[in-house]
Regions:
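Bacterial Sec-dependent N-terminal signal peptides
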Residues: 1-27
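Outer-membrane beta-barrel biogenesis signature
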Residues: 8, 22-42, 47-58, 131, ...
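Residues on the lipid-exposed face of transmembrane beta-strands in outer-membrane beta-barrel proteins
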Residues: 40, 44, 69-78, 112-117, ...
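Transmembrane beta-barrel strands of outer-membrane/channel proteins
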Residues: 40-48, 87-91, 127-129, 177-181, ...
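Surface-exposed coil loops of outer-membrane beta-barrel proteins
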Residues: 45, 50-66, 95-112, 120-201, ...
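Outer-membrane beta-barrel pore domains
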Residues: 58-64, 95-106, 212-340
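Glycine- and aromatic-enriched membrane insertion/assembly motifs of diderm outer-membrane
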Residues: 62-94, 252
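Repeated loop/turn-to-beta-strand initiation elements of outer-membrane beta-barrel proteins
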Residues: 82-85, 122-125, 172-177, 202-207, ...
Protein backbone atom coordinates (compact mmCIF):
# COMPACT_ATOMS: atom_id res chain seq x y z
CA UNK A 1 0.00 0.00 0.00
CA UNK A 2 2.90 2.39 0.71
CA UNK A 3 4.31 1.90 -2.80
CA UNK A 4 0.85 2.44 -4.30
CA UNK A 5 0.42 5.67 -2.35
CA UNK A 6 3.81 6.98 -3.55
CA UNK A 7 2.89 6.16 -7.14
CA UNK A 8 -0.43 8.01 -6.94
CA UNK A 9 1.29 10.98 -5.29
CA UNK A 10 3.87 11.25 -8.07
CA UNK A 11 1.23 10.97 -10.80
CA UNK A 12 -0.87 13.64 -9.08
CA UNK A 13 2.07 16.07 -8.77
CA UNK A 14 3.06 15.56 -12.41
CA UNK A 15 -0.53 16.27 -13.50
CA UNK A 16 -0.63 19.53 -11.54
CA UNK A 17 2.74 20.66 -12.94
CA UNK A 18 1.62 19.95 -16.50
CA UNK A 19 -1.56 22.02 -16.25
CA UNK A 20 0.28 24.84 -14.47
CA UNK A 21 2.91 24.99 -17.21
CA UNK A 22 0.26 25.10 -19.93
CA UNK A 23 -1.63 27.88 -18.18
CA UNK A 24 1.51 29.95 -17.46
CA UNK A 25 1.57 31.09 -21.10
CA UNK A 26 -2.02 32.39 -20.94
CA UNK A 27 -2.32 35.97 -19.70
CA UNK A 28 -5.48 37.94 -19.16
CA UNK A 29 -5.43 41.72 -18.90
CA UNK A 30 -9.13 42.01 -18.05
CA UNK A 31 -10.11 43.41 -14.66
CA UNK A 32 -11.14 40.56 -12.31
CA UNK A 33 -14.55 40.62 -10.69
CA UNK A 34 -14.01 39.72 -7.02
CA UNK A 35 -16.56 39.10 -4.30
CA UNK A 36 -16.47 38.44 -0.58
CA UNK A 37 -19.28 36.38 0.96
CA UNK A 38 -20.31 35.69 4.53
CA UNK A 39 -22.74 32.83 5.21
CA UNK A 40 -23.52 30.11 7.72
CA UNK A 41 -26.08 28.22 9.79
CA UNK A 42 -27.16 27.65 13.35
CA UNK A 43 -29.19 24.68 14.60
CA UNK A 44 -30.75 23.56 17.87
CA UNK A 45 -32.96 20.59 18.68
CA UNK A 46 -34.91 18.50 21.17
CA UNK A 47 -34.44 14.73 21.26
CA UNK A 48 -36.07 11.86 23.16
CA UNK A 49 -35.76 8.08 22.87
CA UNK A 50 -38.69 7.33 25.22
CA UNK A 51 -36.42 5.14 27.39
CA UNK A 52 -35.40 5.14 31.05
CA UNK A 53 -31.78 5.84 30.15
CA UNK A 54 -30.87 8.44 27.51
CA UNK A 55 -29.72 6.34 24.56
CA UNK A 56 -29.23 7.23 20.92
CA UNK A 57 -28.41 5.42 17.68
CA UNK A 58 -24.68 5.07 17.11
CA UNK A 59 -24.64 7.77 14.44
CA UNK A 60 -23.07 11.22 14.41
CA UNK A 61 -24.83 14.40 15.51
CA UNK A 62 -28.40 14.77 16.85
CA UNK A 63 -27.54 12.20 19.54
CA UNK A 64 -27.79 14.27 22.75
CA UNK A 65 -30.76 13.99 25.08
CA UNK A 66 -33.45 16.59 25.77
CA UNK A 67 -33.00 20.20 24.69
CA UNK A 68 -29.64 20.27 22.92
CA UNK A 69 -27.34 22.41 20.83
CA UNK A 70 -26.20 21.63 17.31
CA UNK A 71 -23.65 24.10 16.02
CA UNK A 72 -23.01 27.61 14.79
CA UNK A 73 -21.26 27.62 11.42
CA UNK A 74 -19.63 30.76 9.95
CA UNK A 75 -18.15 30.78 6.45
CA UNK A 76 -16.08 33.55 4.89
CA UNK A 77 -15.28 33.08 1.20
CA UNK A 78 -13.63 35.07 -1.54
CA UNK A 79 -14.15 34.44 -5.23
CA UNK A 80 -11.89 36.13 -7.75
CA UNK A 81 -11.62 35.65 -11.48
CA UNK A 82 -8.88 33.04 -11.20
CA UNK A 83 -8.68 32.16 -7.52
CA UNK A 84 -10.41 32.19 -4.18
CA UNK A 85 -10.58 30.74 -0.68
CA UNK A 86 -12.99 29.39 1.93
CA UNK A 87 -12.57 29.75 5.71
CA UNK A 88 -15.26 27.77 7.55
CA UNK A 89 -15.39 27.63 11.37
CA UNK A 90 -17.78 25.76 13.66
CA UNK A 91 -18.80 26.01 17.32
CA UNK A 92 -20.93 23.66 19.42
CA UNK A 93 -21.33 19.89 19.88
CA UNK A 94 -22.05 19.12 16.21
CA UNK A 95 -19.06 21.18 15.16
CA UNK A 96 -16.75 19.49 17.67
CA UNK A 97 -17.84 16.05 16.48
CA UNK A 98 -17.26 17.07 12.86
CA UNK A 99 -13.61 18.05 13.44
CA UNK A 100 -12.69 15.36 15.98
CA UNK A 101 -9.45 14.67 14.10
CA UNK A 102 -8.08 18.15 14.87
CA UNK A 103 -5.95 17.92 18.00
CA UNK A 104 -4.63 21.50 18.13
CA UNK A 105 -6.37 24.24 20.10
CA UNK A 106 -7.71 26.65 17.48
CA UNK A 107 -7.92 23.91 14.83
CA UNK A 108 -10.82 22.37 16.75
CA UNK A 109 -12.96 25.17 15.30
CA UNK A 110 -11.84 24.76 11.67
CA UNK A 111 -14.29 22.83 9.51
CA UNK A 112 -12.77 23.86 6.18
CA UNK A 113 -9.81 26.02 5.21
CA UNK A 114 -8.67 25.95 1.61
CA UNK A 115 -7.63 28.03 -1.39
CA UNK A 116 -8.18 27.24 -5.06
CA UNK A 117 -6.82 28.40 -8.40
CA UNK A 118 -8.38 28.00 -11.85
CA UNK A 119 -5.37 26.87 -13.85
CA UNK A 120 -7.24 26.41 -17.14
CA UNK A 121 -10.74 26.50 -18.55
CA UNK A 122 -12.71 23.90 -16.59
CA UNK A 123 -9.71 22.89 -14.46
CA UNK A 124 -9.07 24.02 -10.88
CA UNK A 125 -6.66 23.00 -8.15
CA UNK A 126 -7.56 23.14 -4.45
CA UNK A 127 -5.14 22.96 -1.52
CA UNK A 128 -6.13 22.74 2.15
CA UNK A 129 -8.82 21.16 4.29
CA UNK A 130 -12.25 20.48 2.76
CA UNK A 131 -15.28 18.33 3.55
CA UNK A 132 -15.44 14.90 1.99
CA UNK A 133 -16.68 14.13 -1.49
CA UNK A 134 -18.00 10.70 -0.46
CA UNK A 135 -21.57 10.02 0.58
CA UNK A 136 -25.02 11.54 0.26
CA UNK A 137 -25.13 13.44 3.55
CA UNK A 138 -22.93 16.31 4.76
CA UNK A 139 -21.93 18.01 8.01
CA UNK A 140 -24.17 21.07 7.58
CA UNK A 141 -27.74 20.32 8.77
CA UNK A 142 -29.16 22.83 6.29
CA UNK A 143 -27.97 20.75 3.32
CA UNK A 144 -29.44 17.45 4.60
CA UNK A 145 -33.11 16.59 4.36
CA UNK A 146 -33.05 14.39 7.48
CA UNK A 147 -31.72 15.97 10.66
CA UNK A 148 -30.19 12.82 12.15
CA UNK A 149 -27.53 11.12 10.04
CA UNK A 150 -26.98 7.69 8.54
CA UNK A 151 -24.48 5.06 9.66
CA UNK A 152 -22.75 5.24 6.27
CA UNK A 153 -22.13 8.97 6.69
CA UNK A 154 -21.14 8.66 10.35
CA UNK A 155 -18.42 6.05 9.78
CA UNK A 156 -17.08 7.29 6.48
CA UNK A 157 -14.71 10.25 6.20
CA UNK A 158 -15.82 13.74 7.26
CA UNK A 159 -12.96 15.81 5.85
CA UNK A 160 -9.69 15.62 3.94
CA UNK A 161 -6.56 17.73 4.03
CA UNK A 162 -4.55 17.66 0.85
CA UNK A 163 -4.65 18.71 -2.79
CA UNK A 164 -7.16 17.91 -5.49
CA UNK A 165 -7.72 18.78 -9.14
CA UNK A 166 -11.26 19.17 -10.48
CA UNK A 167 -12.00 18.77 -14.18
CA UNK A 168 -15.29 20.09 -15.56
CA UNK A 169 -15.38 18.10 -18.79
CA UNK A 170 -18.89 19.17 -19.78
CA UNK A 171 -22.12 20.28 -18.12
CA UNK A 172 -22.86 16.64 -17.27
CA UNK A 173 -19.43 15.06 -16.81
CA UNK A 174 -16.80 15.85 -14.17
CA UNK A 175 -13.69 14.26 -12.71
CA UNK A 176 -11.74 14.84 -9.51
CA UNK A 177 -8.44 13.32 -8.40
CA UNK A 178 -6.62 14.09 -5.17
CA UNK A 179 -3.94 13.13 -2.68
CA UNK A 180 -4.70 13.62 1.02
CA UNK A 181 -3.57 12.91 4.54
CA UNK A 182 -5.20 9.88 6.07
CA UNK A 183 -8.92 10.38 6.69
CA UNK A 184 -9.83 13.15 9.16
CA UNK A 185 -6.19 14.08 9.89
CA UNK A 186 -7.14 17.67 9.27
CA UNK A 187 -4.20 19.64 10.72
CA UNK A 188 -1.20 17.72 9.42
CA UNK A 189 0.07 14.32 8.37
CA UNK A 190 0.89 12.58 11.65
CA UNK A 191 1.72 9.08 10.37
CA UNK A 192 3.36 9.83 6.96
CA UNK A 193 0.75 7.78 5.10
CA UNK A 194 -1.26 9.32 2.29
CA UNK A 195 -4.61 8.54 0.72
CA UNK A 196 -5.72 8.73 -2.90
CA UNK A 197 -9.20 9.92 -3.84
CA UNK A 198 -11.16 10.16 -7.06
CA UNK A 199 -14.67 11.05 -8.16
CA UNK A 200 -16.39 10.56 -11.50
CA UNK A 201 -19.60 12.52 -12.07
CA UNK A 202 -21.98 11.47 -14.82
CA UNK A 203 -25.33 13.22 -15.27
CA UNK A 204 -25.85 13.84 -11.56
CA UNK A 205 -24.59 10.40 -10.46
CA UNK A 206 -21.24 10.08 -8.68
CA UNK A 207 -18.80 7.21 -8.22
CA UNK A 208 -16.33 7.93 -5.41
CA UNK A 209 -13.12 6.17 -4.44
CA UNK A 210 -10.86 6.57 -1.40
CA UNK A 211 -7.80 4.36 -0.86
CA UNK A 212 -5.16 4.66 1.85
CA UNK A 213 -3.05 2.62 4.24
CA UNK A 214 -5.11 -0.55 4.85
CA UNK A 215 -8.26 1.32 3.80
CA UNK A 216 -10.39 1.15 0.68
CA UNK A 217 -13.84 2.65 0.16
CA UNK A 218 -16.03 2.66 -2.93
CA UNK A 219 -19.17 4.80 -2.87
CA UNK A 220 -22.09 5.65 -5.14
CA UNK A 221 -24.15 8.79 -4.56
CA UNK A 222 -26.94 10.00 -6.78
CA UNK A 223 -30.62 10.56 -7.28
CA UNK A 224 -33.42 10.99 -9.76
CA UNK A 225 -36.28 13.45 -10.19
CA UNK A 226 -39.14 11.03 -10.77
CA UNK A 227 -41.59 13.92 -11.13
CA UNK A 228 -41.74 17.67 -10.51
CA UNK A 229 -42.47 17.02 -6.83
CA UNK A 230 -40.90 13.61 -6.13
CA UNK A 231 -37.17 12.96 -5.78
CA UNK A 232 -35.39 9.70 -4.97
CA UNK A 233 -31.88 9.93 -3.53
CA UNK A 234 -29.58 6.90 -3.38
CA UNK A 235 -26.37 6.10 -1.51
CA UNK A 236 -24.44 2.82 -1.44
CA UNK A 237 -20.99 2.22 -0.02
CA UNK A 238 -18.53 -0.47 0.96
CA UNK A 239 -15.33 -0.05 2.98
CA UNK A 240 -12.61 -2.50 3.95
CA UNK A 241 -9.91 -2.03 6.57
CA UNK A 242 -7.15 -4.26 7.92
CA UNK A 243 -8.01 -7.95 7.93
CA UNK A 244 -11.70 -8.66 7.44
CA UNK A 245 -12.90 -5.51 9.23
CA UNK A 246 -15.20 -3.23 7.31
CA UNK A 247 -18.73 -2.05 6.65
CA UNK A 248 -21.24 -1.70 3.84
CA UNK A 249 -24.62 -0.11 3.43
CA UNK A 250 -27.33 1.19 1.16
CA UNK A 251 -29.91 3.92 1.71
CA UNK A 252 -32.87 5.30 -0.23
CA UNK A 253 -34.12 8.86 0.27
CA UNK A 254 -37.61 9.37 -1.22
CA UNK A 255 -38.75 13.00 -0.82
CA UNK A 256 -42.10 14.55 -1.70
CA UNK A 257 -42.56 18.32 -1.98
CA UNK A 258 -46.18 19.20 -1.24
CA UNK A 259 -45.91 23.01 -1.39
CA UNK A 260 -43.38 25.84 -1.54
CA UNK A 261 -43.00 25.63 2.23
CA UNK A 262 -43.35 21.92 3.11
CA UNK A 263 -41.80 18.61 2.10
CA UNK A 264 -41.75 15.16 3.65
CA UNK A 265 -39.03 12.57 3.24
CA UNK A 266 -37.99 9.10 4.34
CA UNK A 267 -34.55 7.56 4.78
CA UNK A 268 -34.39 3.79 4.74
CA UNK A 269 -30.88 2.51 5.49
CA UNK A 270 -29.45 -0.99 5.81
CA UNK A 271 -25.98 -1.03 7.37
CA UNK A 272 -23.77 -4.03 8.14
CA UNK A 273 -20.32 -4.39 9.68
CA UNK A 274 -17.84 -7.25 9.86
CA UNK A 275 -15.23 -8.42 12.34
CA UNK A 276 -16.07 -5.95 15.10
CA UNK A 277 -15.74 -2.74 13.08
CA UNK A 278 -17.22 -0.87 16.05
CA UNK A 279 -20.21 1.03 14.75
CA UNK A 280 -22.60 -1.52 16.25
CA UNK A 281 -20.56 -4.13 18.16
CA UNK A 282 -16.95 -4.56 19.25
CA UNK A 283 -16.68 -8.20 18.15
CA UNK A 284 -18.13 -10.26 15.32
CA UNK A 285 -20.62 -9.20 12.67
CA UNK A 286 -23.78 -7.12 13.06
CA UNK A 287 -26.30 -5.14 11.05
CA UNK A 288 -28.91 -2.45 11.57
CA UNK A 289 -31.95 -1.28 9.63
CA UNK A 290 -33.32 2.19 10.25
CA UNK A 291 -36.30 4.17 8.98
CA UNK A 292 -36.29 7.94 9.46
CA UNK A 293 -39.37 10.01 8.62
CA UNK A 294 -38.75 13.76 8.45
CA UNK A 295 -40.99 16.72 7.78
CA UNK A 296 -39.40 19.95 6.57
CA UNK A 297 -41.21 23.26 6.96
CA UNK A 298 -39.44 26.26 5.41
CA UNK A 299 -40.14 29.97 5.83
CA UNK A 300 -37.49 32.18 4.28
CA UNK A 301 -34.16 31.23 5.88
CA UNK A 302 -35.84 29.31 8.71
CA UNK A 303 -36.38 25.52 8.73
CA UNK A 304 -38.32 23.40 11.20
CA UNK A 305 -37.83 19.62 11.08
CA UNK A 306 -39.82 17.15 13.19
CA UNK A 307 -38.44 13.63 12.83
CA UNK A 308 -39.28 10.08 13.91
CA UNK A 309 -36.60 7.39 13.66
CA UNK A 310 -36.86 3.62 14.15
CA UNK A 311 -33.69 1.49 14.49
CA UNK A 312 -33.65 -2.30 14.50
CA UNK A 313 -30.35 -4.15 15.03
CA UNK A 314 -29.33 -7.80 14.78
CA UNK A 315 -28.32 -7.86 18.45
CA UNK A 316 -29.22 -6.02 21.65
CA UNK A 317 -27.03 -2.95 21.28
CA UNK A 318 -29.30 -0.27 22.77
CA UNK A 319 -29.07 0.18 26.57
CA UNK A 320 -32.60 1.37 27.30
CA UNK A 321 -32.24 1.08 31.11
CA UNK A 322 -29.50 0.24 33.66
CA UNK A 323 -30.49 -3.43 33.49
CA UNK A 324 -32.03 -3.87 30.04
CA UNK A 325 -30.81 -3.82 26.45
CA UNK A 326 -32.87 -3.99 23.29
CA UNK A 327 -32.52 -4.73 19.59
CA UNK A 328 -34.72 -1.76 18.67
CA UNK A 329 -34.94 1.93 19.47
CA UNK A 330 -37.45 4.69 18.69
CA UNK A 331 -36.26 8.30 18.63
CA UNK A 332 -38.06 11.61 18.20
CA UNK A 333 -36.24 14.78 17.16
CA UNK A 334 -37.51 18.32 16.68
CA UNK A 335 -34.96 20.68 15.13
CA UNK A 336 -34.79 24.33 14.14
CA UNK A 337 -32.23 25.51 11.58
CA UNK A 338 -31.48 29.01 10.37
CA UNK A 339 -29.33 29.83 7.35
CA UNK A 340 -27.83 33.16 6.34
Amino acid sequence: MKKSNKFFTRVFICTMMTFTAINAQDTDDSVPQSTFNFSGTIDTYFRSSFTEDPVAPGTSFANLNGFSLGMANFIVSYEGEKSGFVADVVFGPRGSDAVFGSVGNSSEMVNQLYAYYNIAEGVSITLGNFNTFLGYEVISPAANFNYSTSYMFSYGPFSHTGAKVDFSISEDVSLMIGVFNQTDQTEANYDRYTAFGAQLGLYGQYINLLAGDEYFQLDYTGGFDLSDSFFLGINATTATLAGDTGFAGIALYPQLTTSDSFAIGLRGEFFSETDGFGALVSEGDADNFSLTLTGSFTSGNFMFKPELRLDSASSEIFAISPTETSESLTSFVMAMIYTF
